[in-house]
């Protein structure tokens, strides 16, 4: 059954056929000719028959065991796979389609399109291997640049870095999906850019809901989606982020576009790596994680960066197991993050959207050398006022606001106005709220919050600050409310 190389693989490379000698769940051992052993990370194909139907499984070579044996991890369930069947080396790693044709479509980790209509075919610009090197040091963008989103709370208090990685924290129902859709819309409108969404090990229902909501809001045509959900084998969940990142790299490097890459959830990437590591028989490291945790995370994160002119900016939803921030999985992720955006239920309960916690969110570029002295000073003052308001909450709850000093009463009034002015209508929610989304330039945001902090708008009613855009919008609403009052 073990045969020498006869078939032509990609780019004319000779490929070999072998036979399956052992199957243990998603782990498959195969024997190949000594002179035609497949390389590490090469994709292997096996035809299996199950319930009267035929399908082709894709495996990825993970280890060379000696005695002409390789150990591979399956990217699909191995039901129907038996010893002795032929296995073919494709001669290259897993490849995925790239280019404009992937927009509006859903793919799995091995590049198969999952939402083609009957009779519809996909004609991609090219196919790229998912295992790629990070950009060379000489090609990286030397300057640190802020990604202006037009969302006041983010731009002022936790600004994003072009080509940076942002951690997105938040439970169910606090507006995470809306924020994701909003960023996709803004990148397309403001930069003419593209978004790629990687669903890594999350619920199939959530993935389906996201597709439906994106279709309804019209952003699906600007987005490519790659899914490896929690019912998939660990090999798929480990590779789906790389498949999505490869599509994003094509938009950045070939089409010279700004790209937004969403990974939901980066913890599941680590979790899948732990499962694969155990299946391969490696000795576990701290808390049972794989010994290669930092290496695997680095290989993914270092490819997400700015090259000269264009950038892949990544928003990564992060699940923190048992809220333990010292757990190796989130701790390893934090080392790569440039900013964090915390979505807080107590803020969404007030009807303030985006429900970003201004005190818990942070950014490494919120410093004078990156954003300028005025931006830094205004942001610091806004945080100081909000922190003082938070400190006074218990006193207000027990004794009432009348018991505060005159200075503290002023701070509470300004904090409540700031809190409401941090809310903003979004493009993604236009069809639900009936109110048009707004983009506020960073200069206007800084000017507005400076005036609020200094008390210039203390005479404006609090309601005027709620869900408005820039200064013009605020002053118009205030005049209307004061005229009514």
UniProtKB/Swiss-Prot annotation:
SMART domains documented for this protein? AAA
Keyword annotations for this protein, in alphabetical order, are: ATP synthesis, ATP-binding, Cell membrane, CF(1), Hydrogen ion transport, Ion transport, Membrane, Nucleotide-binding, Translocase, Transport
Domain of life of the native organism: Bacteria
- Detail which positions bind ATP: 170-177
Q: What is its EC number?
A: 7.1.2.2
Q: What is its main location?
A: membrane
Task: Give the record's subunit note.
Answer: F-type ATPases have 2 components, CF(1) - the catalytic core - and CF(0) - the membrane proton channel. CF(1) has five subunits: alpha(3), beta(3), gamma(1), delta(1), epsilon(1). CF(0) has three main subunits: a(1), b(2) and c(9-12). The alpha and beta chains form an alternating ring which encloses part of the gamma chain. CF(1) is attached to CF(0) by a central stalk formed by the gamma and epsilon chains, while a peripheral stalk is formed by the delta and b chains.
Per its record, how is this protein called by name? ATP synthase subunit beta
Q: Which organism is it from?
A: Salinispora arenicola (strain CNS-205)
